[in-house]
UniProtKB/Swiss-Prot annotation:
The keyword Chloroplast applies. Keywords: Chloroplast, Plastid, Ribonucleoprotein, Ribosomal protein. Part of the 50S ribosomal subunit. The gene is rpl16. One of its GO terms (biological process) is mitochondrial translation. HAMAP family: Ribosomal_uL16. It is found in: Plastid, Chloroplast. It holds the Pfam family Ribosomal_L16. Belongs to the universal ribosomal protein uL16 family. NCBIfam families: rplP_bact. This is Large ribosomal subunit protein uL16c. GO terms for molecular function: rRNA binding; structural constituent of ribosome. InterPro entries: Ribosomal_uL16 (IPR047873), Ribosomal_uL16_bact-type (IPR000114), Ribosomal_uL16_CS (IPR020798), Ribosomal_uL16_dom (IPR016180), Ribosomal_uL16_sf (IPR036920).
Length: 136
C-alpha cells in the first residue's frame, strides 16, 4: 500500500476541504480518467483496491496511472481511553481529494474496456465520480 517513506512531522491537523481542485484536474498521461465530484479523504487501502480492480479487468493490455498519493496521516486513539494525554498514534494514510481531481488515468486500451475498468474502480471509491475521455 502507498505511504510516504519519511515525513517531516508524524502527526497533522485534520484541515478542511474548501473549494475545488485546481491542480491535478486534467488528463496528463492516458486517454481515459476517473474524476472525483465530491470532497473526501481516500485511504491508501481504497486507492490500492481501485488500482487492483482496474489492473485485473484490463489484464495485460493498457497502462494505469494513479494520480493521487496518501500523504496525510490519520491518528486514532485506542478505544475506551480517557480524554487527555495527547493525540492518538498514526493509524493509516489518506489522500485529500477535492472535486475535480483526477484519481486514475488509463491508456492503451479501447474505450469500452477503459469505461468498464474505471467504473469498477469507481465502485470502490467512497464518492461520486465520473468517466472522462481526452478530447483531441
Amino acid at each position: 500500500m502507498l505511504s510516504p517513506k519519511r515525513t517531516r512531522f508524524r502527526k497533522q491537523h485534520r484541515g478542511r476541504m474548501k473549494g475545488k481542485s485546481y491542480r491535478g484536474n486534467c488528463i496528463c498521461f492516458g486517454r481515459y480518467a476517473l474524476q472525483a465530484l465530491e470532497p473526501t479523504w481516500i485511504t491508501a487501502r481504497q486507492i490500492e483496491a481501485g488500482r487492483r480492480a482496474m489492473t485485473r479487468y484490463a489484464r495485460r493490455g493498457g497502462k494505469i496511472w494513479v494520480r493521487i498519493f496518501p500523504d496525510k496521516p490519520v491518528t486514532i486513539r485506542p478505544t475506551e481511553t480517557r480524554m487527555g494525554s495527547g493525540k492518538g498514534s498514526p493509524e493509516y494514510w489518506v489522500a485529500v481529494v477535492k472535486p475535480g481531481r483526477i484519481l486514475y488515468e488509463m491508456g492503451g486500451v479501447s474505450e469500452t474496456v477503459a469505461r468498464v475498468a474505471i467504473s469498477i474502480a469507481a465502485s470502490k471509491m467512497p464518492i461520486r465520480s465520473q468517466f472522462l475521455r481526452l478530447e483531441i
